[in-house]
Curated annotation (Swiss-Prot):
Keywords: Acetylation, ER-Golgi transport, Golgi apparatus, Transport. It comes from Bos taurus. InterPro entries: TPC11 (IPR021773), TRAPPC11_C (IPR025876). The keyword Ribosomal protein does not apply. Component of the multisubunit TRAPP (transport protein particle) complex, which includes at least TRAPPC2, TRAPPC2L, TRAPPC3, TRAPPC3L, TRAPPC4, TRAPPC5, TRAPPC8, TRAPPC9, TRAPPC10, TRAPPC11 and TRAPPC12. It is found in: Golgi apparatus; Golgi apparatus, cis-Golgi network. GO terms for biological process: vesicle-mediated transport. This is Trafficking protein particle complex subunit 11. The gene is TRAPPC11. Belongs to the TRAPPC11 family. PANTHER family: FOIE GRAS, TRAFFICKING PROTEIN PARTICLE COMPLEX SUBUNIT 11.
Amino acid sequence: MSPTQWDFPVELCCRPMAFVTLTGLDVVYNAVHRAVWDAFCANRRADRVPISFKVLPGDHEYPKCRPKRTSYEWYIPKGILKTGWMNKHLNLVPALVVVFYELDWDEPQWKEKQSECATRVEIVRQSLQGRNTKVAVVLIQKKTPLPPGEDVIASERAAALCNACELSGKSLFVLPHTDHLVGYIIRLENAFYEHAQTYYYTEIRRVKSHKEFLNKTTHQLLFVRHQFKIAFFSELKQDTQNALKNYRTAYNLVHELRAHETNILEIKTMAGFINYKICRLCFQHNTPLDAIAQFRKHIDLCKKKIGSAELAFEHAAWMSKQFQAFGDLFDEAIKLGLTAIQTQNPGFYYQQAAYYAQERKQLAKALCNHEASVTYPNPDPLETQAGVLDFYGQRSWRQGVLSFDLSDPEKEKVGILAIQLKERSVVHSEVIITLLSNAVAQFKKYKCPRMKSHLMVQMGEEYYYAKDYTKALKLLDYVMCDYRSEGWWTLLTSILTTALKCSYLMAQLKDYITYSLELLGRASTLKDDQKSRIEKNLINVLMNESPDPEPDCDILAVKTAQKLWVDRISLAGSNVFTIGVQDFVPFVQCKAKFHAPSFHVDVPVQFDVYLKADCPHPIRFSKLCISFNNQEYNQFCVIEEASKASDVLENLTQGKMCLVPGKTRKFLFKFVAKTEDVGKKIEITSVDLVLGSEAGRCVVLNWQGGGGDAASAQEALQASRSFKRRPRLPDSEVHWDGIVIQASTMIISRVPNISVHLRHDPPALTNEMYCLVVTVQSHEKSPIRDVKLTAGLKPGQDANLTQKTHVTLHGTELCDESYPALLTDIPIGDLQPGEQLEKAVYVRCGTVGSRMFLVYVSYLINTAIEGKETVCKCHKDETVTIETVFPFDVAVKFVSTKFEHLERVYADIPFLLMTDLLSASPWALTIVSSELQLAPSMTPVDQLESQVDRVVLQTGESASECFCLRCPSVGNVEGGVATGHYVISWKRTSATDGVPVISTVITLPHVIVENIPLHVNADLPSFGRVRESLPVRYHLQNKTDLVQDVEISVEPSDAFMFSGLKQIRLRILPGTEQEMLYNFYPLMAGYQQLPSLNINLLRFPNFTNQLLRRFIPTSIFVKPQGRLVDDASIAAA
């Protein structure tokens, strides 16, 4: 049997569609016919009716219809389903034949055309004689027909044509060849589909009618056949629900058949076909659980029906195909929108199909192991006269034989031999790899990494069996990483063993060495004798000799490999193989550890490299070298031991590079760091351990960083979580798990032996030249030189502080914006042992708040390291936080000449500006001077002189000044009028004369200025006396450009009598002044209220007496009347 026997037929797997043939179309030479055909078949959308079209000539011979049986009494079927039946009804026997004919209703030669059309229809009927196939006629017309009933001629001629062709009116169609051709074609399709539905319905009834004549004794096969045919016709009719129902019935009937070795293959074949149909329809109906349940039932029923033991591999092949087909159906359903999950996806079915394909391979290897002298039978028992079997699932040498007894055992034996010999030619590995590849793709899609890796291992092994070692190695190498990272050491060992065989058979030196190194290591679960063999082979390779063959390899492949190894040895090339071990687990472990996280530059840097071998025998290495990020140190960290390649496993009790299995070996390295690396990190970039010698071959094991391989991280985690007590070891040995890799260290400067002291008087005052005295004293035993000072604001603080902080060495002059915030590398000379010096640094802080200041002193000193003279740079820094505060608080207020608080002032009316300085400094302050800098809008009433010169203020004390000002009329200014600045010059009382005076500028507040229409000024003595005349003059000044009508009245007071106009009305011209004179006569002593002056402005009713009383006094102090004395007593007084 051919290896493609197990593939399902195409007609079974496709979607059944109604078959309609089109005749009368010349699609080659007639453009109209070609356009009609293209409209039927080109670019069919999913929403169009499911019909399969085919163009055939009018006289095409269709398959002959067999005569119908009237009785099945003596009929014995020869099989279940003929191999050509499905194809016949899909592609050969149409449900409808459509005759296309070009004929218009107004055709002049109508009779002749009608007769020709009837003849064509009759020819088609003759070729379909005995079948129920429907016939229809389509008239291709050039004109668009009129609506039904309007064209009388068309109606008459259509009836006549139907009569001539013996057609019903429903089987005659008109197809106008217009711009809307596709629309007409779609309507035609729908009509054809209805005719096809009728045909398949008739066929179903015809098949059902046969069942009445069947009996269960001799016609069991026919029950299955008829049920399958009904289901298949239902599918063609697109009645999928009834199709599924009938397929299920047919499936049950198949398993009711009496099974025997002679018909078991036919039963399984038909069961597989029907199961495929059931599962396909379940997926189509979006009931995947039903499909899965049906498939499981199918497998449970069939997995024990093996058949002939000599052909057991056929059953495995059949089972593999069942799983593969279901996987294909499942995957197709997913592409159409079905949702799968991790635990239920097509990958599991492809995996099971691959499993049965592997079983098939093993069975074939066991059953088809004939000697070379056995030849293929002649004549070929697998050949048939027609080239194909008559019935599905039957043997070619006994087709149609239903007897359970083998009439010709010899013929049966020859047939089985032919099948076995054919099976030997099947490339099973290709089948298995294809199925595994499909499964891997599915598990990758559904994020099942372990299943994917497991199947990739099987693929690699299958490639190995297929002798495609390159692909096998590629796959196995890909999955090793997963098994290493998760610690599946047994699985990893198995994979490595296969990979080692592949690399040996291809004579791949580097791969062979790499896998050997890992199989010798702690991750390998091989026994010691196997490891010893691999170790011996590895040493042979390093000695430029061929290794011994790996066990269980194909004999022919081994012979080819031995030739390749001979060629490898003879070829001249690079004999050094560098292998990075961070991605696998070699037989040597490495850990590097610096003694400390940092080293002073005047102390040698020391670190240990720990090595531990896990191979079965002691082994000697030739070289150990360490690489750093600064390659200048590499030369100091090399251990080398000259030895021959043959000494790798000899003289192992001697030599410093010998590693004993299970024992930790420590190598100490030290070197002197360069002064240029102070402040830098020294890092071990790699550790190289060389096995072998350059005379033969040598392997360089390269650890990145300070060591560690693919298993180190997991082992360290397990060790940290373990509560197991570690056994005690001798003092010279250490526990490997207790060693922690430390691959980097910092080089820091030499410890300084100087003292740095800071002297200052905090807090600092804003804008003052704050003095910070730095005292540096040397405690070194030798002179230090090139002493430099860096002082100022510590970097990394707020940028605003940097802009407002300035540092200088000269305290006699003020800093400006050009001075930096940090003075760097100020040379201060050399210092002898015990000598000290002072340096004053002045800082000006422009804003309040905390600042961190840095004082950094560096110097050079000669020192001896490991007997070598070296210049070391040392430094010491001190930081201090200084708070900056305002030296004093300044309060400013505006008052009237009566010392009443003013919210606003009035144009040209004098007012008072009062300042109050409150000392906020903890130190005494000296106010050197003060100055009032008026804005142009303000004028002084009298001379502006400082009233606080040379005043010393202690903490909490205050000093006040008062200035009389006048503001001319400036109109309506929004936001008020600027007053000016108040400048205070001050310094600390304790400061020396050379310290500059600090000027603090206070911006005075703006004031609102209002214009008043009338200004009243009173001119009166400072006090009065009882019963003595008190002259008072009121000056009324018109401040407007209008003539003012003024009403004046004086209200008497109980404390005074007065003479003058008690009530008067007068006019005051613009800009002029009017004087009113009154004589007040005090009657009582004490602080008395004056007679009240009331003014009413007719033009300005808002001018109130309350406003008036801001300008004139309302009371005066009256002294009591004194005794009469002479002039001498007055003079004496």
